[in-house]
Design a protein with these regions (language model features):
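Bacterial N-terminal signal peptides that target proteins for export
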Residues: 1-11
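Hydrophobic alpha-helical transmembrane segments of integral membrane proteins
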Residues: 2, 16-17
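N-terminal regions of proteins, emphasizing targeting and processing segments when present
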Residues: 9, 18-20
Length: 161
C-alpha cells in the first residue's frame, strides 16, 4: 500500500521540474517505496497536480534525502520506461570487480535540468546531479533489488492511467 505524505520539499522540487506555473499548485505526492541507508534515503514516488488534465498531470519521482539536504529527479510517463530499461540493463551488468556506467537520463521541460546516472557494480547505483541541489548517490543492494524494481513498475502503471 502506498504511503501518502505531505513532502513539501519534494513537491517544490517536482513543481520546479514540471513548470514554473506549478510552483503555486497544490499537488499530491504518493510515496510508493522508501529505501534507507544510515545517512541517505531514496523515495520512489509520484507527483500529481490536480490543476492539470490526466494523464499529463503526473510525474514519477526519485527523491533523495540526506538529513536536511534534499534533491529530486522527475520523469513524465513517456520517459519513465527509459528508467526501467536502464534499471534492467544495470541489474544484468553487475560485477564484483568494477563499476560501469549503464546510462544517464535528463529531466525535460525545466531550466534547471537534473541528471540521473545509473551504474552497475556490486549493486546498482543511482546518482543525481543538479544545479538546483546537492549531488547524491544511492546504492540499491541485492537484497532490495526486487522491491526497487517493483516500485519502478508500480510508478509506471500509475503514470499510464
Amino acid at each position: 500500500m502506498p504511503i501518502r505524505v505531505p513532502l513539501a520539499w519534494l513537491a517544490a522540487a517536482v513543481a520546479v521540474a514540471l513548470s514554473p506555473a506549478l510552483l503555486l499548485a497544490k499537488g499530491q505526492i504518493e510515496v510508493v517505496a522508501k529505501f534507507q541507508r544510515p545517512n541517505l534515503e531514496l523515495d520512489v514516488a509520484t507527483y500529481t497536480d490536480p490543476e492539470f488534465e490526466s494523464p499529463g498531470n503526473k510525474v514519477g519521482v526519485l527523491g533523495f534525502a540526506s538529513g536536511p539536504v534534499r534533491n529530486s529527479f522527475s520523469l513524465r510517463g513517456e520517459d519513465w520506461a527509459q528508467l526501467t530499461d536502464l534499471w534492467a540493463k544495470a541489474t544484468r551488468m553487475q560485477s564484483r570487480k568494477q563499476w560501469r556506467t549503464v546510462g544517464t537520463l535528463s529531466e525535460r521541460g525545466t531550466a534547471e535540468v537534473s541528471r540521473l546516472t545509473v551504474s552497475a557494480g556490486q549493486g546498482v547505483r543511482l546518482a543525481i546531479t543538479s544545479p538546483k541541489g546537492a549531488s547524491m548517490a544511492f546504492l540499491v543492494g541485492s537484497a532490495e533489488m526486487a522491491r526497487f524494481e517493483a516500485a519502478l513498475a508500480q510508478v509506471k502503471d500509475i503514470l499510464a492511467k
